[in-house]
Amino acid sequence: TETRPKLLREAAVGNIAHDPNGHGYQPYVGIPELRKGFAAWYQRWYGVDLNPNTEIQPLIGSKEGILHVTLAFVNPGEQVLVPNPGYPTYTSLSKILGAEVINYDLKEEDGWMPDFETLENMDLGRVKLMWTNYPNMPTGANATPELYERLVDFARRKNLVIVNDNPYSFILNEKPISILSVPGAKECCIEFNSMSKSHNMPGWRIGMLASNPEFVQWILKVKSNIDSGMFRAMQLAAATALEAEADWYDGNNRNYRNRRHLAGEIMKALGCTYDEKQVGMFLWGK
């Protein structure tokens, strides 16, 4: 079954064949068409207004953003809060760059949400970043508006930056939400997104981050010393793919539901239990 937007393939072929500027260096900030595409996508699906010129930074996949953000915000010896369980790269890159990792536990009895009472009682004087990831890898827990409101309030009061990794919000999820929908969140939050997950195109390496203009400029200062931009044809094709209609996402999720059902049957055959309300691309059981 075709699991990528048809218009992505058509746009890619056309752009590679006919764009005479496609073989040169591209802007560090990404081409305007892609930035505008991400801005329109965020407005349409998350209800979040982003300035495409100052509040969006395309990435060569959102994974590289973990490196860029850590370099921009954390000095060696400073601390970062990392969820446990969680994406291993938050921990490994922090350690490589000399930061101290402080785990905060996500527990089943709390719905795999942060325990704010425990966090409030921690010494956070050296903490610069707090990594969050919803829909969560690997537990499948989904975010709520209330969770995002609490995280923004926590970041403001504790003078730290929340980095919300949000690549799975279109997978088996009725209503994608963004932490940036919380009023004032841009002041203290950065959000990642990834077309690897939302549009099934991991080999294209197209992601993005969004935040306030000052944070974006700090990150761009790091990024511009690491790479020299993405292939123009891929950026143009990605901008076109961001125009996919709801029926494409619905069809994609039908495929995921079929796969989730098969995975669930395997789990049951093994005597495992799991929460059927999980969203995203993981099935977490025991």
Task: Identify the function of each model-found stretch.
Residues A239, Y256-M267, Y274-K286:
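Conserved glycine-rich beta-strand-loop-beta hairpin in the small C-terminal domain of fold type I
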Residues I219-I226, A241-E265:
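Structural signature of PLP-dependent enzymes
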Residues I102, L106-I177:
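Active-site phosphate-binding strand-loop segment of PLP-dependent enzymes
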